[in-house]
């Protein structure tokens, strides 16, 4: 059985992945429609690039079970892929630090299709604050 790391265990160079998923045509269309976008690329069957953000969160959750808040996200698109393509996401913790009394970690994830880079996703997470009982 896999044991998940705690947020505190996520130090620089902590490897994440691989995560392999296939985004179906129906799921891809739901992503586009939920964003309120009717774009020619949707009609052409192209994957919705912000899916990379969701894959980064899924990749993170494979390794850390702590509840977190995503505080920053940046996605860079390198090329286009079609729906129903198998994607692979791998990542690494690039920084772990404290700011304003809260722990943070920064992750860079690469999403690829057939070995070719599709998207680079950069994200920052902080653990959800826990509050003591006032009883």
Language model feature labels by segment:
Residues 1-72, 132-135:
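Hot-dog-fold acyl-thioester-processing enzymes
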Residues 2-5, 81-88, 92-135:
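HotDog/MaoC-like acyl-thioester-processing domains
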Residues 49-94, 103, 122:
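Hydrophobic beta-strand-centered segment that forms part of the acyl-chain substrate-binding groove
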């Amino acid at each position: 059985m896999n044991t998940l790391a705690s947020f505190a265990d996520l130090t620089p160079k902590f490897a994440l992945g691989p995560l392999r998923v296939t985004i179906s045509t129906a799921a891809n269309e739901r992503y586009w429609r939920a964003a309120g976008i009717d774009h020619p690329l949707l009609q052409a069957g192209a994957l919705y690039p912000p899916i990379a953000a969701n894959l980064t969160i899924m990749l993170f959750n494979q390794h850390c079970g702590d509840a977190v808040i995503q505080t920053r996200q940046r996605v860079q698109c390198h090329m286009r892929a079609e729906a129903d393509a198998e994607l692979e996401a791998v990542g690494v913790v690039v920084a772990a630090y404290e700011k304003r009394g809260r722990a943070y970690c920064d992750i860079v994830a690469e999403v690829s299709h057939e070995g070719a880079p599709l998207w680079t996703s950069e994200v920052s997470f902080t653990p959800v604050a826990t509050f003591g009982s006032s009883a």
